[in-house]
Swiss-Prot record:
Transmembrane regions listed in the UniProt entry: 4-24, 38-58, 89-109, 122-142, 171-191, 211-233, 241-261, 273-293, 301-320, 325-347, 366-386, 405-424, 457-477, 488-508, 537-557, 582-602
Name this protein carries in UniProt: NADH-ubiquinone oxidoreductase chain 5
Keyword set, alphabetical order: Electron transport, Membrane, Mitochondrion, Mitochondrion inner membrane, NAD, Respiratory chain, Translocase, Transmembrane, Transmembrane helix, Transport, Ubiquinone
Claim: ATP-binding is one of the keywords in the record: no
Catalytic activity: a ubiquinone + NADH + 5 H(+)(in) = a ubiquinol + NAD(+) + 4 H(+)(out)
Subcellular location as annotated: Mitochondrion inner membrane
EC number(s) given by UniProt: 7.1.1.2
Gene Ontology cellular-component annotations: mitochondrial inner membrane
Family the UniProt entry places it in: Belongs to the complex I subunit 5 family.
Organism: Pongo pygmaeus (Bornean orangutan)
Pfam family, one: Proton_antipo_M
Length: 603
């Protein structure tokens, strides 16, 4: 076990020198990005040793190195939990990040601040590793906030663009809503368990209150972009493509699902929170799939596919299968990073064109990118024997076996079919047909820093699911004993979506342009959610505050007290004065007649 913990600690500490190098020598040379890439590749190689030892021994470990602080009743220590989840995810995250770093050498070659960009990506990875290896809630919260702030910095990397700044602010604000739930959970456990160590929290709360679990679900919904807190995820595409690849594959967006996986010993005894997670995930996966159907930006399509897969992971949490959700996180990391890399390769070679309607014919001009895009899209759709199949098919089989509501299962199957449909649509628009770009361009697919990471991730997308399920079997995976028609449900849904997309694409080429129906606008405008939340509600609140200040203050109190009051007094005075006609004889006569009458009465 000493060897196991030593090699794991070496893996974690090998990522620190590139950060300290920037503090010692701020004027970094051009070799710094290569240094960071090599450090991550070395960390990945080292991490294979403790992961292999864990597979052989199967014994989880908790390393407690240093006591941070001690109050009267609470002790906080720096502790790492090296169990099935962290030891499996560590090499996956390092491998994917290594490939993304090498891809960034090609994609960001002309950026003057590429050294800082690589440093930010490395810190992003380190904060995610802190999150997955944390053994107490405070350490987990540090990693949680770390991925949040690094996502803000990386999404707004091109800070001169208004859209990039707006997207970064959206990401940080929506995540602050989720952080409210996390802090609520922290406070509840401190008050009731007097500890933030995970093993003590699980031991003392066999039947926990609904409140901390609701806080955890809110935190996960914010970080993993579930319905209601989802608009920041497609907006985050304003960042560079390597940022999108890292953000969506193995870091920030899966952090919320990973949080619920960590706390599954508490959730498995609480049916209401499981039902809530199931329904939330089912609605999210269907909504995101519907939105992806009509998007024309290639990165937005991949972003909504991420949101849909996160909903599927939430469904898996809801049917009490955390190991299955974790398996899908691991397989999803490979093909999602590959999808973004292929998108980045296409965008870069087509002079930053992202509209799939202006692409076409790339199958011959970019063969490796086209092959990789097809493989990753099929893995996303759950095509048999690709990496996504081993997790996605098992999720749907388990959901069909579980004693849960058929409504959630039905819309999950519909979302699976739609996933196949929008993946096929993207492939047909980008790779087949005639080139639709208005100007001739020079396509170069021969750079090794582009080809090598794509080849590595393509290999991962082909074989990772098989390797993980064969060599690292979790003890709680369900043994599915379903009838044949249920066994083929997921595959049938995938093939149905594929055929529908092919047929619709064939028909669309012969249709005349007409006014689209309202349902089309629901999909293209993302369910009108951004218009309502980001436009209508702020507009109504600003209008109400303007009317209050205008009607109550300016038009009522101020005018009644000052201008209108003075005006009314002056008007009445001037009216009184203006009634005087200046006829002095008549005035004296009117005075004299009453005087004479009075004298006569007296006498």
């Amino acid at each position: 076990m000493a060897m196991f913990t030593t090699m794991t600690a070496l893996t974690l500490t090998s990522l620190i020198p590139p950060i300290t190098a920037t503090l010692i020598n701020p004027n970094k040379k051009n070799s710094y990005p290569h240094y960071v890439k090599t450090a991550i590749a070395s960390a990945f190689t080292i991490s294979l040793i403790p992961t292999t030892m864990f597979i052989c021994l199967g014994q989880e470990t908790i390393i407690t190195n240093w006591c941070w602080t001690t109050t009267q009743t609470l002790q906080l220590s720096l502790s790492f939990k090296l169990d099935y989840f962290s030891m499996t995810f560590l090499p996956v995250a390092l491998f994917v990040t290594w490939s993304i770093m090498e891809f960034s050498l090609w994609y960001m070659a002309s950026d003057p601040n590429i050294n800082q960009f690589f440093k930010y990506l490395l810190i992003f990875l380190i904060t995610m590793i802190i999150l997955i290896t944390a053994n107490n809630l405070l350490q987990l919260f540090i990693g949680w906030e770390g991925v949040g702030i690094m996502s803000f910095l990386l999404i707004s990397w091109w800070y001169a663009r208004t859209d990039a700044n707006t997207a970064a602010i959206q990401a940080i604000l929506y995540n602050r809503i989720g952080d409210i739930g996390f802090i609520l959970t922290l406070a509840w456990f401190l008050l009731h368990s007097n500890s933030w160590e995970l093993q003590q929290v699980f031991l003392l709360n066999n039947n926990p209150n609904l409140l901390p679990l609701l806080g955890l679900l809110l935190a996960a919904a914010g970080k993993s972009a579930q319905l209601g807190l989802h608009p920041w995820l497609p907006s985050a595409m304003e960042g560079p493509t390597p940022v999108s690849a890292l953000l969506h594959s193995s870091t920030m967006v899966v952090a919320g699902i990973f949080l619920l996986i960590r706390f599954h010993p508490l959730m498995e005894n609480n049916p209401p929170i499981q039902t809530l997670a199931l329904c939330l995930g089912a609605i999210t996966t269907l909504f995101a799939a519907i939105c992806a159907l009509t998007q024309n930006d290639i990165k937005k399509i991949v972003a909504f596919s991420t949101s849909s897969q996160l909903g599927l992971m939430m469904v898996t949490i809801g049917i009490n299968q955390p190991h299955l959700a974790f398996l899908h996180i691991c397989t999803h990391a490979f093909f999602k990073a590959l999808l973004f890399m292929c998108s980045g390769s296409i965008i870069h070679n087509l002079n930053n064109e992202q509209d799939i309607r202006k692409m076409g014919g790339l199958l011959k001009t970019m063969p490796l990118t086209s092959t990789s895009l097809t493989i990753s899209s099929l893995a996303l759709a759950g095509m048999p024997f690709l990496s996504g199949f081993y997790s996605k098919d098992l999720i749907i089989e388990t959901a069909s076996m579980s004693y849960t509501n058929a409504w959630a299962l039905s819309i999950t199957l519909i979302a699976t079919s739609l996933t196949s449909a929008y993946s096929t649509r993207m492939i047909l628009h980008t790779l087949t047909g005639k080139p639709l770009l208005p100007t001739p361009i020079s396509i170069n697919e021969n750079n090794p820093t582009l080809l090598n990471p794509i080849k590595r991730l393509m290999t991962g997308s082909l074989f990772t699911g098989f390797l993980i399920t064969s060599n690292i079997p979790p003890t709680s995976l369900p043994q599915t004993t379903t009838p044949l028609y249920l066994k083929l449900a997921a595959l049938t849904a995938t093939l149905l979506g594929l055929l529908v997309a092919l047929d619709l694409n064939y028909l669309a080429n012969k249709l005349k342009v007409k006014t689209p129906p309202p349902a089309f606008y629901f999909s293209t405008m993302l369910g009108f959610y951004p218009n309502i939340i980001h436009r209508m509600i702020p507009h109504l609140s600003l209008l109400m505050s303007q009317n209050l200040s205008l009607l109550l203050l300016d038009l009522t109190w101020l005018e009644k007290l000052m201008p209108k009051a003075i005006s009314q007094h002056q008007t009445s005075a001037s009216t009184t004065i203006s009634t005087q006609k200046g006829m002095i004889k008549l005035y004296f006569l009117s005075f004299l007649i009453p005087l004479l009458l009075t004298l006569l009465m007296i006498s």
